């Protein structure tokens, strides 16, 4: 059997790994448009419930990625000068690039054919394959080529957000609510790299607001640096 996978992100790579573990004789090719070390975003988060499923499905890969985890059990909400803490949730964060590197290594060791900097226009690029998997993201060309079958829909939400990174440590999944003369801003922040998982602490810091607030703050015409400075002053 031959399988072609469009998209070398975590989903495509992990599917390839699970299929290879299930049947090593299957020939699997993963095709990715970007380079192996290209990534978008900072960190990824998994709940303990999801990680339990990963551990049961593939203990070896679970052990490989778990060395990179930053774990926390609490959720902190900061609002009106107070901190509200809720415990017992269980999450782990890690660098998205770190996750890709681990999965690429495992897939390569299992004999998956990984091809980078290669475009996929549609299922026809995998003409000899018995199964084609579309793991090519929100704007999937594979899914679009069978739009009448999959009937995809996009529900675009109105809020505006900026995805920032910081070297500040967060011991909990952290939410801030901060209001000024322009309106209400909210943040969710989490640590994805720490002393155990990397040379320095790194965290994701996402700021969100309504479009009306975004415009009143003048952020609709702000540069990246001006946006960062505004958020830095606010939080």
Task: Explain the meaning of each model-derived region.
Residues 37-40, 85-86, 214-216:
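A short acidic, helix-capping loop that chelates divalent metal ions and anchors anionic groups
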Residues 48-165:
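Conserved N-terminal helical subregion
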Residues 1-11:
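Beta1/beta-strand and adjacent pyrophosphate-binding region of the FAD-binding site
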Residues 105, 128-131, 135-235:
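Conserved FAD-binding catalytic core of PHBH/FMO-like flavoproteins
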């Amino acid at each position: 059997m031959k399988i072609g996978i469009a998209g070398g992100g975590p989903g495509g790579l992990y599917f390839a790994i699970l299929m290879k573990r299930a049947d090593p004789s299957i020939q699997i090719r993963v095709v990715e448009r970007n380079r192996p070390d290209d990534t978008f975003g900072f960190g990824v988060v998994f709940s303990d419930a999801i990680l339990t499923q990963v551990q049961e499905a593939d203990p070896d890969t679970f052990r490989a990625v778990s060395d990179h985890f930053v774990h926390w059990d609490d959720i902190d909400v900061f609002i009106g000068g107070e901190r509200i803490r809720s415990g017992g949730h269980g999450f782990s964060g890690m660098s998205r690039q770190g996750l890709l590197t681990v999965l690429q290594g495992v897939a390569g060791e299992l004999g998956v054919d990984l091809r980078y900097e290669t475009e996929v226009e549609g299922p026809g690029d995998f003409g000899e394959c018995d199964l084609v998997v579309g793991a090519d993201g929100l704007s999937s060309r594979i899914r679009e080529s069978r739009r009448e079958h999959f009937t995809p829909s996009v529900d675009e939400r109105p809020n505006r957000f900026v995805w920032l990174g910081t070297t500040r440590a967060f011991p909990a999944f952290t939410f801030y609510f901060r209001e000024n003369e322009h309106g209400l801003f909210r943040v969710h922040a989490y640590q994805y790299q720490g002393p155990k998982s990397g040379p320095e602490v790194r965290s994701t810091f996402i700021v969100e607001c309504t479009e009306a607030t975004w415009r009143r703050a003048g952020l609709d015409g702000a540069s990246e640096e001006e946006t960062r400075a505004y958020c830095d002053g606010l939080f």
